[in-house]
Amino acid sequence: MSVLERLRSELGDIVDTSAEALEQARADRSGHRSPGRPLAVVHARTVDDVQSTMRIASATRTPVVVRGAGTGLAGAANAGPGQIVLSLTAMDRILEVRPDDLLAVVEPGILNATLNARLAEQGVWWAPDPASREISTIGGNIATGAGGLLCAKYGVVRDAVLGLDLVLADGRLMHLGHRSVKGVTGLDLTSLVIGSEGRLGVVVGATLKLRRLVAGPVCAITASFGSVRDAAAASAAVTAAGLQPAVMELMDARSLAAVHDLLSLPAPAPGTAQLTIQTDGPATLDDAARIVAVLRASGGVADMTSDPAEGERLLGIRRSMHPAMAALGTTLIEDVSVPRSAMPAMFDEIARIEQAYGISIPTVAHAGDGNLHPNFIFDGEEVPPRIWDAAGELFRAALRLGGTLTGEHGIGMLKSRWLAEELGEDQWELQRQIVRVFDPLGILNPGKVFSDA
């Protein structure tokens, strides 16, 4: 009996071999596509479905690619020939919400924004807010260790997960972590799985750490600067002053101009970079006033509003970055992080690389935590070698400045060739050994993160 026959025999009509499903599973939002269609898509509805799929895959040594909404930007969920796609989007229930304990138990397929809309009814929220929050799943957020605009103040996914239910490659179900605020029993396998991009197991449930909804007004600040370096230095000055905005976003001149063009807004002055900042909590007005003072002292033209609608409009300009880039051509959206004080130097490096390669690299940044998203624009579907060469220089520049290859998008298959440069050979090999402990047969998402684990 073939693998496909075994899947159909045990799982029935949740096994999908339609051309549409198979084509969709070849790509994510990175622009990269696998070389061919996978074997089948299993639309799991229960933990038992996941376990059955993994047992069949293990018995037949068939590779499995776990997939949520396919909104990733590093190719981690792209499936190719001979692989089973295990889709978790149908596992989208909220199993439990405990406002008294500030926790929720959810299945992996629920969308980030859908979860928070439901949680808001009980006065709580889950803090990670990636730009894809309207369309990305909690399972995908966990797989990549996602962040977002609010993470400088409220943390990333790793700060907001208490426990995970994990199906291993052989189909066994593990319950990792705890429901309590504290817990140091044994090794922290929950944190190990977060950000592992489907290499260690299949997340089928998550116990999430919630927060109370933040009460009171929210202030929004915009500040314009004559150069992106000045804007980056001003954002570092805000942090150095001991101020903690909820959101601090930076748009360089090219990204700001592209978004204004997309939204039919008046064109900014040439070379203008912009900071968009949001404060919240009991001290929001005082914090905003102090931040405005720092920005003006740093040479910025700053304005503040406490009008909620205007604040959302201003943040909407930043959130329109991805469609603005898509309007310019095919986009390789990159993701590096550096210490916040090194952001001006990182923008200097980007300018150097632009000049050396004769290209434009529109860049936005989560300035509150030093996470930059340079965008490489090109024609066609495949990334040209020259663009990869420029990206490689950019990655190495981030490493030289004490940073990292990825702050929130993950390694996937697009950055695996540079991973050993950051980790060093010993740590790279140790991490590959850890993958083999969880998945001795190497059937979970092979070729991703570690090209040959």
Predicted regions and their residues:
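Noncatalytic alpha-helical scaffold of FAD-dependent oxidoreductases
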Residues: 1-453
